[in-house]
Amino acid sequence: MPQPAKVLLLYAHPESQDSVANRVLLKPAIQHNNVTVHDLYARYPDFFIDTPYEQALLREHDVIVFQHPLYTYSCPALLKEWLDRVLSRGFASGPGGNQLVGKYWRSVITTGEPESAYRYDALNRYPMSDVLRPFELTAAMCRMHWMPPIIVYWARRQSPQTLASHAKAYGEWLANPVSAGGY
């Protein structure tokens, strides 16, 4: 039987202790031998990112998952710093920047608003696909495969049963992340 793809789960939440939804989503991830959970805020409380170490982690994995809350239509500050430092020209893009070619990118996002808020005629004025476009473009710049994002809308208002259902589906996907279909 073939080995499952190696997954690097980059977790970026500056207030992880207060995020019930993200803690529930992380539970199945830590149970899989093919998944490396890498908590950026725990590792880099001072925001000084060890770029060579991070790039080595990326080389060792096939699927890169970016799990974080949606902050001001983007990601938390440390993840943005990580993207700018680690996905550098010559490593992930530009001349010689071929280290991530063919790997997979999947965003796993929690939001504080319902899905209905992400429409052209609604509160946020744009659908989530537009909000996440910079991440999709970054994946394309790195010549990675963009996978449909997993979004848990209105995360803090979801029932424990709904969050458990999301976590179960997420865990099943993590077990075999590049198979056809899935969560």
UniProtKB/Swiss-Prot annotation:
Its Gene Ontology cellular component terms are: plasma membrane
Q: Name one Pfam family in it.
A: Flavodoxin_2
- Could you list this entry's UniProt keywords, alphabetically sorted: Cell inner membrane, Cell membrane, Membrane, NAD, Oxidoreductase
Q: Where in the cell is it found?
A: Cell inner membrane
Transmembrane stretches in the record are none
Q: What is its membrane topology?
A: Peripheral membrane protein
Q: Which reaction does it catalyse?
A: a quinone + NADH + H(+) = a quinol + NAD(+); a quinone + NADPH + H(+) = a quinol + NADP(+)
**Keyword Cell inner membrane carried by entry:** yes
Q: Among its keywords, does the record have Cell membrane?
A: yes
A biological process (GO) annotation for this entry? potassium ion transport
Task: Give the main location.
Answer: membrane
GO terms, molecular function: electron transfer activity; FMN binding; NADH:ubiquinone reductase (non-electrogenic) activity; NADPH dehydrogenase (quinone) activity
Which EC class is this protein assigned?
A: oxidoreductase
- InterPro entries on file: Flavodoxin_fold (IPR003680), Flavoprotein-like_sf (IPR029039), K_H_efflux_KefG (IPR023947), KefG/KefF (IPR046980)
Per the UniProt entry, the Enzyme Commission number(s) are 1.6.5.2
Role description: Regulatory subunit of a potassium efflux system that confers protection against electrophiles. Required for full activity of KefB.
Describe the subunit structure: Interacts with KefB.
Query: What family does the database annotate?
Result: Belongs to the NAD(P)H dehydrogenase (quinone) family. KefG subfamily.
Q: What name appears for this protein in its UniProt entry?
A: Glutathione-regulated potassium-efflux system ancillary protein KefG
Its source organism is Salmonella paratyphi B (strain ATCC BAA-1250 / SPB7)
Question: Gene for this protein?
Answer: kefG
